[in-house]
Regions:
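Active-site activation/catalytic loop segments of kinase-like enzymes and analogous catalytic loops
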Residues: 229-267, 280-299
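Active-site acidic catalytic loop and adjacent metal/ATP-binding pocket
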Residues: 30-43, 48-49, 180-227
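A cross-family kinase active-site recognition segment
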Residues: 87-91, 107-172, 182-193, 219-223, ...
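ATP-binding pocket architecture of kinase catalytic cores
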Residues: 30-152, 189
Length: 352
């Protein structure tokens, strides 16, 4: 298991083993902010090394690198994501390998001021030309993305009996999952597009040109843009990262959706009826993930380098304390009720 203190020496050895052109550049570990990766700056190279702690999709170490490479390469055409620069293979020094990507220099997103920029960047992703189905691998491309999402939420919610959870919250989770499954039983679906599926504001850096750059691209897939729009603006997303924390009003949410719709033309017009249903689904995914993390984070780290691993010991203690605080907050009855009220308010506004 890699720690931040070990990273420079391990990364240096991996660079030297392949005689990489950046083998001798200074290496600077960044603050531990995420549960899936360490990040190391290759000083002077304009590059970052993304060193996986785990695969959130449950992939082998090599498959995880290939998946992330595809994410960056597909998204880069949009002009609002970092460029893919290469990879370091799975090795003794880096058991999960590393991806090398362009370093984006800038600041954290400020909400609500940067919401129009985030909407524009997501619109650029969502309006990319959809490749033929045969050319979409290795990215997820479920036969029915809505049903696949409901199944994933169900798998996460299966951890409810193993955790301490307020009964009203458990009942709400079960009721909302039932609502989603009923939606799946109908035939109507929104338009499928390339999406990030991890578009919370903490994953954006605003550069010197005021461009909102989406820098974390490990879970991209072909699914529904409304999931990204929700993940960018849900309370469980906007208050996740301390550097971007904000609570948005219904008016600010409506303005965000309007900005995205204006930038996407017919796609935006057809998507409006799905904004609230997909927002509820993305929130349900988020809080069921919180349940899963609460259940699994106390387990010891896995000995091998493949698959999913939420062990708290893989991350800095300050980061884990922050995540635990957020998980407890989002699973509290008051916050669950607050989100349900927001969904109702948005539904009324969209129908007005």
């Amino acid at each position: 298991m890699l720690s931040n203190s070990e990273l420079p020496d391990r990364l240096r050895a991996a660079l030297q083993a392949v005689d990489h052109r950046w083998r001798d550049v200074p290496l600077e570990p960044l603050r531990d902010k995420g549960l899936a990766h360490h990040h190391v700056r290759l000083v002077g190279a304009g590059a970052l090394a993304r060193v996986p702690k785990q695969s959130q999709l449950g992939l082998s170490a090599a498959a995880n690198l290939a998946y992330q490479r595809a994410c960056f390469e597909c998204a880069s055409v949009s002009g609002c994501t970092p460029q893919y620069l290469g990879f370091l293979p799975v090795s003794v020094d880096l058991p999960r390998g590393a991806l090398l990507v362009q370093e984006v220099v800038g600041r954290s997103a400020l909400l609500p001021a940067d919401l129009p920029g985030i909407a524009g960047s997501l619109a650029a992703l969502h309006t990319l030309t959809l490749p033929l189905a045969s050319a979409r691998a290795p990215l997820l491309n479920a036969v029915d993305p809505l049903a696949a999402l409901a199944d994933e939420i169900g798998e996460q919610a299966a951890h409810v009996p193993a955790v301490s959870l307020d009964r009203s919250v458990a009942l709400t989770l079960d009721r909302e999952l039932g609502r989603l499954r009923r939606l799946c039983s109908a035939t109507a679906r929104p338009e499928r597009r390339f999406i990030a599926f991890d578009a919370h504001p903490g994953n954006f850096i605003v550069d010197a040109q005021d461009r909102a750059v989406l820098v974390d691209l490990e879970k991209c897939r072909y699914s529904y843009p409304g999931l990204d729009l929700a993940h960018a603006t849900l309370y469980t997303s906007t208050t996740w990262d301390v550097d971007t924390s904000a609570s948005l009003t219904v008016r600010e949410l409506l303005d965000f959706y309007a900005a995205w719709s204006a930038a996407t033309g017919p796609l935006g017009t057809g998507a409006q009826a799905w904004h609230v249903p997909l927002r509820r689904a993305m929130w349900l995914w988020s809080i069921s993930w919180c349940v899963k993390w609460r259940a699994l984070s106390g387990l010891p780290a896995m000995a091998n380098a493949d698959g999913e691993d939420w062990a708290a010991e893989r991350s800095d203690t300050a980061l884990i304390a922050h995540v635990r605080d957020r998980v407890d907050h989002y699973l509290s009855p008051g916050i669950v009720g607050q989100l349900l009220d927001e969904f109702d308010a948005l539904e009324r506004a969209f129908c007005a």
